[in-house]
Structures are given as C-alpha cells and as structure tokens.
Amino acid sequence: MKIYYENDIDMEILADKKIAVIGYGSQGEAQARNMADSGLNVIVGLRRGGSSWKKAHDDGMNVMTIEDASREADIIHILIPDEIQETVFEQSIRPYLKEGNTISFSHGYNIHYGYIKAPEGVNVTMVAPKGPGAMVRRTYLEGFGIPGLVAVEVDATGDAMEQALAMAKACGLARAGVLETTFREETETDLFGEQAVLCGGVTELINTAFKTLVRAGYQPEIAYFETCHELKLIVDLIYERGFRGMWHNVSNTAEFGGLTRRGRIITEETEKEMDEILKEIQNGKFAKEWALENRAGAPMLKRMRKLESELEIEEVGSKLRKLCGLEK
C-alpha cells in the first residue's frame, strides 16, 4: 500500500483554486481552518442564520451561503451529515457546478450508494481524516497530524488525485501519512467498523456484561467500573502498542483468563452475524433501510435513543463520571 508524506505532495496545484467547505461541524471547522492556515483560499458555505454561521465568522472564515460558495468555488468539499447531503447537493450545489470543478467528501457513502451523481466533467474525490475533527485541529496546531485517506471516484481533469493529496497535506494529514483507497472500500469498511465494533458491538458487549454482574447481585457501581470505565485503559494500550503490548501490560491472570474465555464470547455464530452485517452493507440493504428511516422522520432511531437513555448503565455511569470529575 502506498503511503504519501509531505515531501511526496505538491500543494502548488491548489494555488489558484478556491475551496468551499460545506458545513462547519467537527470536521468542517477543523479542515477549513487547517487548510486556511496552510495558505489555501478557503470559503465556508452554510445555511444563512444557522447555528454555525456566527461561529465560522468569529473564527475569521469567509462565510457565505451554500449556493454562493458553490458558485464561487473550484472545489466543493461537502462535510455535512450523510442523510442531508443528497438534498443539499441537488438544491444548492449541483445547479452551480461547472466543468472542471471538483466535489469532495470525507466519507464515500452518498457517492458509493448512488445518492449523489456528479455531472459530466466534474471530479469526485475524497479526503478523509482518520479521527475526529477536534483531533485533526489539535494535532495540526501541535505541528503534527493524524493519518488520512484519499480516493478518486471520477477523474475528469486528469489531476484529481493530485488535488486530493494537496488538500490532505493542507489539513495536516500527510505529516502522519496518507493512504490511497477507493470510495467503496472506505464506505464499506467504515460502516462495518461502526456497526460491528466501534459503536454497535462494543456498547452491546459492555451493557450485556454490566447486566450479567448486576443480575448476579453485584453492586451496579462496581459492575460499571469493571465492564465500562476500565475499558479506556485497555483500548489505549491496544491503540498505542497493539494486542501484544496490551497483553504484556496486564496481569498474567488477566491474560490467561482473557485468552481462554474470549472464544466463548465471540463465537462462530457471532462471526456468521458479522458476515451478514457486512453483506447488508455491501449489497446496499443497510443504505436503503437508513434512507427509508430518514424519509419517515427517523422514528426507529428516536425510539432507540430513548431506550438507550433509560438504560441502568447510563444512570450509574453518569453518577460515577461525576465522581471522577469527567462529567459536571
């Protein structure tokens, strides 16, 4: 796999380009400010009167409506939530695109599943930091950065990859390393990671383990510490040193117990379900389900959010996070 670093990338290709960042949330703010601080001509496109308008203006950004930003820019970098991108694109971006323009994303979802289709003669690229916006900005200011991905779905001008790499460098990503991928690979692996591990799998594992201890008569507070609070310590070890480094830094008892029991938690049946989850991502079933959910006003999501907020582990966790000074 090719990894690009700062010395591999020439930002001169963007010298005469105007870049519109659409959205000013976590990623929008970080990427817009980093690119501006790197000397690029950046404008921010927002809904007039929206909550982010004043924030972006106070940060010194050149703020205008999405329509005006799309009309003025050579590169339109779309960093608003997946579920509203199609509507915003069709209403406020597509009418102003010109041949030779570039539309860029930090997640391939809407391009990969066909909800957004670029007009003829327009590049489609991706610049995707592998971390939250706050970290993208903080590490940039510290003189380093976080790794990132770049991809090209449509190269209408012959230099789309060079543009994407230059944007990644301007965001600070090439300081750590930029990897080339595809829209399909980024989208499908990102969704699978979220569903099977990072957001879905981990929370279900934690809550099930917590309920097991409470059901057996242990104090909920102790159960929380053992199944949730201490998870960060282990994840940090894995993040910094890998599995081997984590095993080396826990007790022999923990290592033996973990290695001999983990296969009883993640079973062959679990692996089959993971395969099924991946298939639903690959064949578009999940994307269709999410689209229908949004068109209906997200009733299932709202209901599940309410149920999550009422979990015992949430009540106990809030109390203990206050005790630890993590929550006010």
From Swiss-Prot:
Residues 1-181 form the KARI N-terminal Rossmann domain. Binds 2 magnesium ions per subunit. NADP(+) binds at Y24, G25, S26, Q27, R47, S52, D82, E83, I84, Q85, G133. It catalyses: (2R)-2,3-dihydroxy-3-methylbutanoate + NADP(+) = (2S)-2-acetolactate + NADPH + H(+); (2R,3R)-2,3-dihydroxy-3-methylpentanoate + NADP(+) = (S)-2-ethyl-2-hydroxy-3-oxobutanoate + NADPH + H(+). Pathway: Amino-acid biosynthesis; L-isoleucine biosynthesis; L-isoleucine from 2-oxobutanoate: step 2/4; Amino-acid biosynthesis; L-valine biosynthesis; L-valine from pyruvate: step 2/4. Substrate binds at S251. Its EC number is 1.1.1.86. Mg(2+) 1 binds at D190, E194. GO terms for molecular function: ketol-acid reductoisomerase activity; magnesium ion binding; NADP binding. Mg(2+) 2 binds at D190, E226, E230. Pfam families: KARI_C, KARI_N. Residues 182-327 form the KARI C-terminal knotted domain. One of its GO terms (biological process) is L-valine biosynthetic process. Its cofactor is Mg(2+). Disulfide bonds: none annotated. Keywords: Amino-acid biosynthesis, Branched-chain amino acid biosynthesis, Magnesium, Metal-binding, NADP, Oxidoreductase. The active site is at H107. It comes from the Archaea. Involved in the biosynthesis of branched-chain amino acids (BCAA). Catalyzes an alkyl-migration followed by a ketol-acid reduction of (S)-2-acetolactate (S2AL) to yield (R)-2,3-dihydroxy-isovalerate. In the isomerase reaction, S2AL is rearranged via a Mg-dependent methyl migration to produce 3-hydroxy-3-methyl-2-ketobutyrate (HMKB). In the reductase reaction, this 2-ketoacid undergoes a metal-dependent reduction by NADPH to yield (R)-2,3-dihydroxy-isovalerate. Belongs to the ketol-acid reductoisomerase family. This is Ketol-acid reductoisomerase (NADP(+)). It comes from Methanothermobacter thermautotrophicus (strain ATCC 29096 / DSM 1053 / JCM 10044 / NBRC 100330 / Delta H).
